[in-house]
């Protein structure tokens, strides 16, 4: 298989060197040896002229490693070859964009992308972040599908070229990437979903709801803007639309993506450094921390290198999804591991998870306090000492129940009533019942009503489920009892054969009757012995 030195994926510039072997070389008279033709193995020829197979004025060289031959190449061919391997061309040396080099690069990208896709399905758990895990898996599948479709199409085209021309040109990869709409669409969708996953990962670092909403709002808008810019640049180039106003859009989109990736890398690295006390005692977390820092910094570093030297422009359409896949997956894995360590530390502590009071307004914490205000211990010594400390230096010591109703005064402890201290409110009253604005009522209704409906529907479903299970259990118990009785009576015998055991049954009433009869007979015999029938008149 031969490789063209014109196998650059970039747009060629002006040619600075003209290869003479493409115009032909006069070899003169001599013998022509053709080992494949046995009939005319050696032929004498005159005025032999030889020209190399060239592609757009650039010769094709054999890419295979052949054995050393004692024959020497003509000086013209050697000069062209030296120019090919030692001099820079339009945008760099062509050897870096040879066919085998490109195949090795894309094969590596394919293996890494597919492996990370499989790992995302095996290791990424849903948990409380179902949407994020779904987006991560979907974007991984799209990236894998894109690279598989790209390699399949490119290799089939190279195979046809080899069969038809006897050579293969690496321009197939660049042409396919710059013209195929399917690959462009898959790459755009995968990178957009990866950016949304990165926004969700950054939002997980903030515990407060307000900060979480700000991150999601700003990050979501930035991701959508980046997606729109990338879509415009990609589709205008592939469809063939030329607009002078869109010339600066492509570099602006690239710089915008670099800024987003730099922010993401900075936040992840800051989190790794900020949580070092949590993972510093675990050896595996050391490896994961170093890997996370290296990979999240790799994306902006590669993009910046591409801007400065054009390093990735030939592979940008496939390297960019790979970099997003690696950084997103590793950052997700880091957060999962550090979250487990934090939860383990919170379980050991007394306080547990943090609760912010301003976030609980209108939520369960406030409702719990209001519903349990009657459970406060108003007769405890702590309340008495608290109120004594509050009003020790106050003028309210001289007021004797002027602000309390009879019902509120009766609810006070006996020790406090005897001191003559008056309070503006009841002891066990929690002051949540302040006058609220219409916006507060509307916000409270918006947040509380769906929660109440959810709780009510959940209780109804649980009650119906419990009732159905109870009825089912009762029916099963009743059927079991009937079956047991039928089995004891022999009613389950299909052959209608019944065997009974005979047994004397003695009832308790029969035993009592026999004992009473025996006692009566004994009593009559004793009476007859003392009072004979004919001796009554002698008494």
UniProtKB/Swiss-Prot annotation:
Where does this protein reside within or beyond the cell? Answer: Cell membrane
Could you give one GO CC term from the UniProt record? Answer: plasma membrane
The similarity annotation says:
Belongs to the palH/RIM21 family.
Instruction: Note the InterPro entries from the entry.
Output: PalH
Task: Provide the species name.
Answer: Candida glabrata (strain ATCC 2001 / BCRC 20586 / JCM 3761 / NBRC 0622 / NRRL Y-65 / CBS 138)
- Its membrane topology: Multi-pass membrane protein
Q: What is this protein called?
A: pH-response regulator protein palH/RIM21
Q: Which residues lie on this side of the membrane: Cytoplasmic?
A: 123-130, 194-213, 270-284, 332-539
Q: Tell me which UniProt keywords the record has, alphabetically.
A: Cell membrane, Membrane, Transmembrane, Transmembrane helix
Keyword Transmembrane carried by entry:
yes
Please verify whether the record's keywords include Transmembrane.
yes
Please explain the role this protein plays, according to its UniProt record.
Answer: Required for the proteolytic cleavage of the transcription factor RIM101 in response to alkaline ambient pH.
Q: Which biological processes are named by the entry's GO terms?
A: cellular response to pH
Any stretches that span the bilayer, and where are they? 102-122, 131-151, 173-193, 214-234, 249-269, 285-305, 311-331
Q: What is its main location?
A: membrane
Record topological domains on the Extracellular side: 1-101, 152-172, 235-248, 306-310
């Amino acid at each position: 298989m031969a490789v063209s030195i014109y196998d650059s994926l970039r747009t060629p510039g002006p040619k600075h060197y003209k290869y003479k072997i493409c115009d032909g070389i006069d070899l003169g008279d001599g013998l022509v040896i053709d080992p494949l033709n046995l009939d005319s193995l050696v032929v004498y020829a005159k005025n032999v002229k030889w020209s190399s197979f060239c592609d757009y004025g650039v010769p094709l060289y054999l890419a295979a490693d052949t054995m050393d031959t004692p024959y020497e190449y003509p000086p013209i061919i050697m000069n062209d070859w030296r120019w090919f391997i030692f001099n820079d061309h339009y945008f760099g040396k062509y050897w870096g964009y040879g066919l085998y080099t490109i195949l090795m690069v894309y094969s590596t990208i394919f293996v890494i992308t597919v492996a990370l896709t499989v790992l995302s399905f095996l290791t990424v758990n849903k948990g409380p972040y179902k949407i994020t895990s779904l987006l991560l898996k979907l974007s991984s599948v799209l990236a894998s599908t894109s690279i598989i479709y790209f390699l399949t199409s490119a290799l089939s085209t190279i195979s046809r070229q080899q069969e038809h021309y006897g050579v293969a040109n690496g321009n197939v990869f660049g042409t396919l990437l710059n013209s195929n709409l399917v690959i462009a669409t898959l790459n755009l969708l995968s990178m957009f979903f990866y950016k949304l996953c990165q926004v969700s990962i950054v939002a997980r670092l903030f515990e407060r709801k307000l900060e979480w909403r700000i991150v999601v709002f700003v990050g979501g808008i930035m991701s959508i803007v980046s997606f729109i810019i990338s879509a415009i640049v990609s589709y205008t180039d592939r469809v063939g639309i030329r607009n002078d106003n869109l010339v600066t859009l492509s570099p602006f989109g690239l710089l915008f993506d670099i800024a987003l990736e730099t922010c993401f890398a900075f936040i992840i690295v800051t989190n790794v450094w900020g949580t070092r006390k949590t993972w510093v005692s675990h050896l595996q977390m050391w490896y994961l921390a170093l890997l996370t820092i290296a990979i999240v910094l790799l994306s902006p570093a590669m993009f910046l290198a591409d801007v400065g030297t054009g390093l990735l422009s030939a592979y940008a359409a496939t390297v960019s999804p790979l970099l997003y896949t690696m950084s997103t997956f590793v950052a997700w894995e880091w957060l999962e591991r550090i979250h487990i360590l934090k939860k383990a530390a919170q379980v050991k502590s007394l306080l547990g998870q943090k609760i912010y009071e301003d976030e609980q307004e209108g939520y369960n914490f406030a409702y719990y306090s209001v519903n349990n205000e009657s459970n406060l211990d108003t007769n405890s010594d702590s309340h008495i000492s608290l109120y004594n400390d509050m009003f020790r230096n106050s003028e309210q010591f001289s007021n004797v129940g002027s602000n309390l109703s009879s019902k509120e005064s009766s609810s006070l402890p006996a020790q406090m009533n005897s001191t003559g201290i008056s309070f503006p409110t009841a002891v066990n009253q929690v002051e949540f019942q302040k006058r609220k604005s219409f916006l507060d009522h509307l916000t409270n209704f918006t947040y509380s009503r769906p929660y109440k409906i959810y709780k009510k529907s959940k209780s109804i479903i649980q009650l119906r489920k419990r009732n159905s299970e109870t009825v089912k259990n009762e029916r099963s118990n009743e059927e079991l009892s009937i079956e047991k009785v039928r089995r004891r009576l022999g009613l389950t015998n299909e052959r209608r054969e019944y065997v009974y055991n005979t047994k004397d049954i003695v009832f308790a009433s029969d035993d009592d009757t026999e004992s009473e009869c025996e006692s009566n007979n004994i009593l009559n015999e004793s009476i007859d012995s003392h009072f004979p029938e004919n001796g009554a008149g002698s008494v």
